[in-house]
From Swiss-Prot:
Residues 1-44, 570-593 are annotated as: Disordered. It comes from Fusarium oxysporum f. sp. lycopersici (strain 4287 / CBS 123668 / FGSC 9935 / NRRL 34936) (Fusarium vascular wilt of tomato). It comes from the Eukaryota. Fusaric acid is phytotoxic to plants such as cotton and banana. It has been shown to induce programmed cell death in plants. In addition to a mild toxicity to animals, fusaric acid exhibits acanthamoebicidal, antioomycete, and antimycobacterial activities. Keywords: Cell membrane, Glycoprotein, Membrane, Transmembrane, Transmembrane helix, Transport. The chain crosses the membrane at residues 98-118, 135-155, 167-187, 195-215, 227-247, 254-274, 337-357, 367-387, 410-430, 438-458, 468-488, 503-523. Signal peptide: none annotated. The gene is FUB11. The keyword Transmembrane applies. Residues 9-43 have a biased composition (Polar residues). This is Efflux pump FUB11. Belongs to the major facilitator superfamily. DHA1 family. Polyamines/proton antiporter (TC 2.A.1.2.16) subfamily. Disulfide bonds: none annotated.
Amino acid sequence: MAIDPQPSSPSLSSETIANDTIGNDNNVNEPSVEPKTQGNQHTVPPRLSRIYSQAHHISQSFIDQNYPGEGTTQAPYRINFLPDDTQNAQLLPRWKKWAFVLLQSLACLATTFASSAYSGGIKQVIRAFGISQEVATLGISLYVLGFTFGPLIWAPLSELYGRKKVFFFTFMVATAFSAGAAGAGSIASLLVLRFLTGSIGSAPLSNAPALIADMFDKSERGLAMCMFSGAPFLGPAIGPIAGGFLGEAAGWRWLHGLMAAFTGVTWIACTVFIPETYAPYILRKRAQHMSKLTGKVYISTLDADKPPSSAAHQLKNALTRPWLLLFKEPIVFITSIYISIIYGTMYMCFAAFPIVFQKGRGWSQGIGGLAFTGIVIGVVLCIISFAFEDKRYARAARKRGAPMEPEDRLPPAIMGSLLIPIGLFWFAWTTFPSVHWIVPIIGTVFFAWGLVLVFMALLNYLIDSYVIFAASIMAANSALRSLFGAAFPLFTRQMYDGLGVQWASSIPAFLALACVPFPFLFYKYGRQIRMKCEYAAEAANVLQKMRSLHVTVTEDDAMNEAEEMWRARTHNSHASAAHSHGHRRSLSYTRSV
């Protein structure tokens, strides 16, 4: 998924500021000084404030560069990062990149931790408000439902206003709402605050992968994504463990206080240490400030050939385009359904495990949370195994000496597709109280291992298959799986009451078993299927163009081109049908005469 780079550099030293900086042109007490220009060289007014330089990272060295263009509205100077530009995220030291990945992964962990930690205090919520189990479970479902809508909004806004601003605002508000939930006076206010926290706090789920793409090139991105991808699964697995003990000992309000504290600490850490990393935003703001300071017109090279796009236009595309691709592309639809089923099964466990271990075996609320240890172990095993898979893929790419096919991403999904039903059936039919408790938990290790293998491999497959449409594809996948994750816990209790523990636990196992052929089919026939899919074929054409001509094509450009091709094919097919129909009528008339 190609997303442009971003971070801001360390602050300029005081000596650098004194000798090589630009100040604040908003000081009304300073006389207006016109900059002197010599060709493309501009002398900055010497009395401008240091604050401007520190805030916007503009130094005289940026102004002194020889940029293409004439500095006019018709032919603006086109700026790009300098060779040693400290604001270019791709040039950050490796240790900083990995530190930022760790911090963003913690932010995702905090968000997903809160989705399931609530289950640890669900008994206390029922007693406090006198509600049913189903109503109390809405606290999980509504939170996860927020994951459906949040990323669709925050992803495009991060491209307009930068990753850092969007994260700062969303996580600040999410922390406040999470703290507010701790003091909720009614079940209605608690559920509303849970939904809002999930919606607003879900920004890292979409922006963290974008930040990784900002900092790492494709050869390094796999390992970083592997590290990040564990967070959305570790969080829900760890949540009931911590939540079970705290909810039992201190009550559900303290549990929400823990969620707010976790979110707040990660908000502060990420805000303080992670700079802006989105290259188009950095260069856009730099061009605006340089234009303001010099009186000349500057524009980012990344924006130079793009038509202006408003926030409303980007939001419209963000909200509609994912669903268009989801329902028009068979590959996207099938893989998203598969991922959604196994993702929903994971969230079903938060309602099923208390039935199996607390009700069935008499475990306490805190000890019952430890049943999720198997899922934690499975996720960790998958992260380790995927690190080796990433090295295998890199070796295969070097050996081939040519671009790898998207289908080369699928071997882990094939393995994972087998592990999931094995683990689920293992769990289902070893839940009898007469069987030692460790046996069903071992089954959840295989389930979680397979789940994350399938999840990561299929997402990589979709990204490589759709390239320029990857952002919309990821949004569609995220929205659909969040809907499943919100829905599955709601019918879990009724299903277990009606079918019994063993058969109810087998339902998702049968669904996973039905999905086993999909990775095999895509591995063998994926290329032929992609070439018959409208947008996958266009993505392949765009990728070929980018490789041969070394040009950058935006998602909007590719979408427009794909839609034009589709309209042309539709017009040609209609014209052909009309011609054929007219020909048949002519023959019929000739025969009748």
